[in-house]
């Protein structure tokens, strides 16, 4: 036996062997490893001399591959057969050895592989087209090698792999590396439970989610599910996302709240088989209006009921079971898509403009809801418009002087005039229901919330009207016209802005002033409480590169009024900062307010501390009109310009021009805003399309 054969049988090649010798030994190693390797895996076996005892024994012949091949085939069969019979008895057990009872496969060989689909076992079919090109004897050898590896336990597999790779040359190792790079990739969303998959997907942004939906049908079912997109809507709609900085227009809060419990249930009971096919464009779904669509649950009787998704209006009888929490709704992904489109239009100023003309004098107040717009003018009339068509629906006449303020809801419209009166109208019919006379001067500001109406007047007072018990009260403290009032029924407080350059916060229970805000050096025209969802971080005050607005450091903090039993030094919580009346669980007033004045500035205040957090500079003349939500502030001024501001950074994002007179009033919605001017026109900017 020569040195090369000894090296092959021992499984150790010489370090000085040529590539040709390595490749020659490679073919032999592929067919059957050395005896020592077999002994290490399958235990001691008979020698070649014990097997071949006939006259054609190879003891006197050279140990070439051709003479060794029949010997190795018999040796492989004798050594491999018991191993395969032990691990795969249903395929390799001798005939007659089975008793008719099904033989269970070893649990070690029946485990599912985490890398492949859970319904497929680790063993895979051979590459049949490639195998057909080989000789039958080679096919048998390769099949034996695959069978051994497939039947081997995990620790044996590692040992076999180590032995194979130890005999591989660099081209083969390179092939292994390239192949493993693809095989090592796992479909983790398929392997994981749905609730964990949803948790992972909720960390992705919208771009990554859309890419994930293109991987496979199952990934699309998971990535497009309402569980993921409802979370995305909660994170971005009506607020600024802290991660990406994006904020989308307002969606009906009630819909988000009603859907949250359903979404949580669906995440725990999700089944890909329940996901419907892609909805046709003409399927009957409840569309989303400009302010967002609503969801009304048809059944909510059991807290532990299973949730089943139903996107179309055709509900089969079996799906009307009370055990299911059913809703018909528009998918949250489509809702997010529409809101994202509107948000992008806001960001880049893409909008359509509709102009409403009809008043004969300057427009002083306006409000719009859905497709209804109401405007009040110095011509002593109120006009109702259809915002979709631009048509004037009706004109409300009754006041004897200019209309300075108005507000409407589904049932009524209340207006205030310089004729010292307030009127309640049925705006759908144009009928004047009642007239209230309580001020000694013109009514220039009003606001109602629930059953409380507040009005501000030229007579320097704020009057509170209670619709429920028909009571009224007068709040005195301002020394000049009261231009604007805002009621917060939850905390039972009222804000008022006056020409005396101050803003006051009133307690409706004690009929007293809680706090006065000082800082403006011009007549304060508007005060707007920000929604409670608005969040303002301290580091936002110290924003760098703020070329438009600066923090007001020279204005004094708001001064709390003298309240018996109230110590400002010991009041460190937001509730106690407003006095002892707010210590018993009573809701606090809105945390932030914005004000505008004829000093050409807008200010953002923290009500609990009275600090002016930011002053917005940009208008050239006095700011008459102001509106705000959680995403933006809109202002109109004597300089005929309308500006859009970011309340967190103070940056002026965009300026709109077009009016030929001072901008006196503004209405703000999630996808549009309207401005009124002394030029007798109303301009509505829509970002929906």
UniProtKB/Swiss-Prot annotation:
Q: Reply yes or no: does the keyword Repeat apply.
A: yes
Record gene name:
sconB
WD repeat ranges per the UniProt record: 358-395, 398-437, 439-475, 477-518, 572-615, 616-655, 658-689
Coiled coil: which residue ranges?
A: none
Q: Name one GO biological process term.
A: protein ubiquitination
Q: By its UniProt entry, which PROSITE patterns does this protein fall under?
A: FBOX, WD_REPEATS_1, WD_REPEATS_2, WD_REPEATS_REGION
Known Pfam families for this protein? F-box-like, WD40
| Matches recorded under Gene3D superfamilies | 1.20.1280.50, YVTN repeat-like/Quinoprotein amine dehydrogenase
Biological source species: Neosartorya fischeri (strain ATCC 1020 / DSM 3700 / CBS 544.65 / FGSC A1164 / JCM 1740 / NRRL 181 / WB 181)
Q: What does this protein do?
A: Component of the SCF(sconB) E3 ubiquitin ligase complex involved in the regulation of sulfur metabolite repression, probably by mediating the inactivation or degradation of the metR transcription factor.
What are the entry keywords? Repeat, Transcription, Transcription regulation, Ubl conjugation pathway, WD repeat
Which named protein is this? Probable E3 ubiquitin ligase complex SCF subunit sconB
Q: Which SMART domains match?
A: FBOX, WD40
- Involved pathway(s): Protein modification; protein ubiquitination
Q: Which residues form the F-box domain?
A: 186-232
